[in-house]
Amino acid sequence: MLIIENLEIEIAIPIYLVENFVIKTVPNMHTVCNIRGVLEKNLGETILTDKKDMDIHIKYKGNTVFRGFVEEISIYSSADVHYFELKAYSYSKKLDNKEHTELFQNIEKTYGDLAREVVRRYSGDISNYNIKDKEIKGPVLCYKESAWAFAVRMASYIKTFLYPGMEYDKPHIHMGIHTGNMIEPGGIISESRDLIKKTENKSRIEYRLRTYNSYDIGDNIALDNKILTLYKKEVEFTKGELIFNFQGVEKSYIQDMIYPLENENIIGLSFMGKIKKYKDGKVYLRLDIDKKEPDYGFDWYPETGNVLYAVPDEGEKAQLYIAGMDTGDMYVVRTFGSKGSDENKKQLEVGKKSLTFSKEGISFIADDILTVNDRRFKLTGNGDVNISAAGKLTIKARNIRLNSKEEIVYISK
């Protein structure tokens, strides 16, 4: 541990001197800490691997100003003086390590509930502060998003921010801004005001404060007959001085700064699942991506266009199509009778993107369905379907039909 007056730095390397550090906390971002200094001795190359991910805890007057883990560290020596630089992040960054995919169908749950569920899957947790949570309007898809990114997106739907919590040596998130203290700023080095104009009739004042005193995000300050809430914080140690930089706005403007975030990657996706129930024109689907029992009945549009004629059976496979980014903008577009009684609808389902013919046999890898039986062979793709051969390709049938909505092009090379 290194102690500099009221400043304590707990870390598992022998620090002789800290030249400077900067800690930045802004909404919806992991807090980052950059430190430069001098070591008591050269720890050798093992520090580059052994000390990565080690805990670092910085306190001022006994209160935590940063808690996180070291992600990058470098050492260089000059005249037997061993300098180091390191970059550390709040433990919330651990929530970015893996991608998650799941469809949340229970519309009685709130956006905060969904964020907490996903975060807890990855050994994290969320505390709520002054949020106006609300139930989801329809099924919500988390598709290849980290737990942190998904939680940020859910927070945006209820017009609030996420902040990394630094109470523990594990991922913890604060959703919303806690109600802080009313402060009388002291030790002011400088202050400024920025007028930020959003539209002709709408603007806000951002207050910047540079001070020797430490405050918390969520604390309030009276200025120009307005109560401003501190929502950004930077801690700076340089030339032996510890300085705190803050930004504040009127709390009512914070919601105006937040816009719903969307996952653009979901548009046009389709997911296979099994029909568990068909009721009142709605299809209840257990998806292959998460294997959860269904809570929501989806509209569906059969390829025949005749909903009454093409009533799906329980146990059939079906495809859920994601039409847009809005909550619940999805429906069932087709069914496949792999478990039904119609022998013409037997199917083979496997993997991702190609159909291969070789001397070893035939292998099929696709997101869609290859239908095979004694009387027909059907290959359907959501996008392009390509069949190629190094030698001769023969197609033989009593009747051969080529049908195109736009054009048929013959190319000979």
Question: At which residue positions do the language-model features occur?
Answer:
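Short, solvent-exposed secondary-structure boundary/capping segments
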Residues: 74-89, 236-249, 283-285, 342-346
